[in-house]
Amino acid sequence: VVGEVDEAWRVNTLENIRLPVRLGQDVFSKGYLEQETIQQTEEAFLRFKHVADNYGVQRMRAVATSAAREASNGSLLIERVMSASGIEIEIISGEEEARLIHLAVVHALNLKNKRTMLIDIGGGSVEVTISTGQNIISTESYNMGTVRLLEKLDTRNNSKHPFGKLVREYAEAARYRIERDIGAEKIQVCAATGGNVEEIGRLRQKLFKGDSDRFVTLDELAELIARLDRLSYEERIRK
């Protein structure tokens, strides 16, 4: 993302680019990054560097999350990208990842004095943050991202176990920690982030003919899960 900050610290997005480099598909199944994947990452960062130079970017930050944290050759990825593009990647913790996401959501939504649960669903991990306004109460990082689960549960190789059932078992293992952090006080806002969440929003709009892809009710979410659970991996991709 390339942005411009004004005197009031408002951010105007100038360009938003997303390139598909699947680090997690290597790391969560093999424990390391293949040379081809590292090369794809180098090429992506060369593209980012070109865009940044065109805009005259003065400050830049690049961060990597769970896949780079866990890859046995994660340091090689950092070195290769730095050598190719001059961009230094910072490998951040799950807690720092959650903090940055919280900052972004607070900036985008009016969360003043509201007790909020933020759920970021990434490829390798899920971060759950409880906050009140701008103050973070607790943050937990769970190793149950979408790419990790697909690799571990072997969905693409026709696993005999229903995908939805196995995912629910993973989620149930984390449930008591989330309920502990929430406590007795009611959650007023639940906000989810990540590419998969955006797809859920678009799918909800398509199936239920809604006006917006930004809001999903609990009943709609339950129906979406039930429908997706009945589909094969290939059918989910086509959806």
Describe these PLM feature segments.
Residues 4-7, 26-59, 65-115, 130-239:
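Helical "lid/coupling" subdomains associated with nucleotide-phosphate turnover
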Residues 98, 123-124:
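Catalytic nucleophile loop
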Residues 120:
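Conserved catalytic-loop position in the HRD/HxD motif
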Residues 124-130:
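Acidic, divalent-metal-coordinating active-site segment for phosphoryl/phosphodiester hydrolysis
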